Structures are given as C-alpha cells and as structure tokens.
Amino acid sequence: MPKVTLIGAGSVVFAKNLLSDCLSYPELSEGTYVLYDIDQERLRTAEKMAHQVAKAWNAKPTIVATTNPVEALEDADYAINMIQVGGYEPCTVTDFEIPKKYGLRQTIGDTLGIGGIFRALRTIPVMLEYADIMEEVCPTSPSSTTSTRWR
C-alpha cells in the first residue's frame, strides 16, 4: 500500500477533500496517510478529521500526524502540497488589498497577477526546503522527481 504525505494538512477542508478522494479508491483505502503541518493544533484537528473520513468510507488506512517534515516525507510514495505560507490573514488578504489600492483587479490570488507574485515569493523558498528533504528521504517519489528535476 502506498504512503501518501499531505504537506500542510492543517488546511483541514482541503485535506478532507483530498483524503476523501483517495480513500474512495479501494487501491488506496488501506494506505498510510501522513498528515504534516507546522501548526500542532491544526494538525490535531486534521488527524481527527482523517479518522472520521476513513470511518465514513469504511476504509482502514494508517493515519500518522507529525510536525517533523523528514519523518513525514521519509519513504513517501506521493507528497501532496497544500501549504499557504503566511496564512489567510494577513497574507492572502494583503494579496488582494494591495492590487485593489492601486486600481488593479486581482482575480485569483494564488496563481495570477500581483497577488500570485506575492504568494510565489512567500512559497517558493519553503517549497525548495521540502524539495531538498524529498531528494534525500523519498527520491523515487514522483513528487520528488518532478520538484527537483528543473533545478
């Protein structure tokens, strides 16, 4: 069974949707799902949610929660990123407010325009740290190969 690491699992709604999608497949329903986040409180919430989702799907996954990125990514078959560096407030709100202040319409703050640039500048350094860890502890993961190939 695969080991799937959810990076930023404290984004509970996003994690719930991803986990539910994964557990809906019999091939993935007994895998190991590692929930990783830097925020212990949000991680505990995500862990409770993961057990509820597994029960709802009548799935029997192994659920692990950790704040240690090396432990989370070690031997991972897949790593799914859902981090939001800086959080919703103040960062995402600012991503919309600054363009608006200068008369620019910000459509989708996480990928386009001025807000997308702000988010990229916050996120890329953190993602490079995870890519370095992945290169060491799960080099055969497709996520690892694609994240480090371009460097």
Language model features with spans:
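Metallocofactor- and cofactor-centric catalytic cores in central/energy metabolism, strongly enriched
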Residues: 1-93, 102, 108-112, 116-151
